[in-house]
């Protein structure tokens, strides 16, 4: 599967998962600013959830969540801070999650949701 198509598949799968399985209200998908991008911004009813989606077809490169290294966490934190500032949401509790997606053998995708996957990164 092409990298762009694989990423799209993963994000759409994660989006359906957070809406249907988790019952989250999705505020934004692929939120971009000059600092970077966040795949999904959702509200679980109490907390704003900034979600990074990682999709893999094989385990050759390790677990998908391992791709969310320090540099990526720092970038996500900066984009989230800018989002909170732009919409005046500083008072809202927030967390950073990772959703791993992989194509399943039976046509059903494999999904692993890692809530509180990391803390906000500073410099």
Task: Please name every model-derived segment.
Residues 3, 34-36, 107:
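Short acidic/glycine-enriched loop/turn segments that link adjacent beta-strands
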Residues 22, 34-38, 94:
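Short beta-strand or tight-loop elements
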Residues 86-123:
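Domain-level recognition of nuclease-like catalytic cores that cleave nucleotide substrates
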Residues 18, 76, 96:
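Residue-level signal for inorganic ion chemistry
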Residues 1-29:
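Acidic-basic catalytic patches of nuclease active cores, encompassing PD-(D/E)XK
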Residues 57-82:
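Mg2+/Mn2+-dependent nuclease catalytic core
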Residues 36, 47-49, 97, 112:
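Protein kinase-like catalytic core scaffold
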Residues 38-59, 76:
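Conserved catalytic cores of phosphodiester-cleaving nucleases, focusing on short active-site segments
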